[in-house]
Regions:
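A short glycine-rich, His/Asp/Glu-containing loop-to-beta-strand
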Residues: 16-60, 66, 121-125
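Short acidic (Asp/Glu) patches
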Residues: 53-56, 74, 80, 100, ...
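Glycine- and acidic-residue-biased ligand/ion/polar-headgroup-sensing regions
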Residues: 64-82, 92
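Ubiquitin-like/PB1-type beta-grasp interaction modules and other compact soluble beta-rich domains
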Residues: 65, 87, 109-111
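Short acidic-glycine-tyrosine-enriched beta hairpin
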Residues: 82-100
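A short hydrophobic beta-strand segment most commonly corresponding to one strand
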Residues: 95, 105-130
Length: 130
């Protein structure tokens, strides 16, 4: 087995047309040793734990401030306008950065994403703010 030299960051972002989309970015793991590859140290503005019950589903909304979301338990589905969705399982993450463009009024038919708990297990997430 070889070492990973990059970490794939899944990003939920607001595109130029106002719609939320997913993209992937690579973060170099250029520090540390071959046995323990590290990224640079990221600044953070705190963290928050959340649990969501079986059956939870939000309405369309935008992220208030960019933050990482790590799935600790259960499964979380993120849905976008147009029917695209993605399910995240324990150990997976996404970087939520689909903020409302400055000067724009929120339109639930255009902006944001919805989230929901999937399956029979409680959803447990960790949010880490920039």
């Amino acid at each position: 087995m070889t070492s990973m030299t990059t970490f794939t960051k899944v990003v939920l972002f607001t595109d130029a047309d106002g719609y939320a989309r997913f993209r992937e970015e690579s973060i170099p793991l250029a520090q540390g040793t071959p046995q323990s590859m590290l990224s640079y140290v990221f600044a953070s503005g705190g963290y928050q734990l959340r649990t969501s019950p079986v059956g939870f589903r939000s309405q369309f909304h935008c992220t208030g401030a960019p933050q990482w979301c790590f799935i600790l338990g259960g499964q979380m589905e993120i849905g976008l306008q147009g029917g695209v969705s993605r399910v995240f399982k324990p150990g997976e993450h996404f970087y939520s950065a689909d903020v409302l463009p400055q000067g724009t009024t929120f339109d639930p038919a255009v902006h944001g994403h919805w989230s929901r708990q999937v399956g029979t297990d409680l959803l447990i997430t960790l949010f880490v703010r920039d």
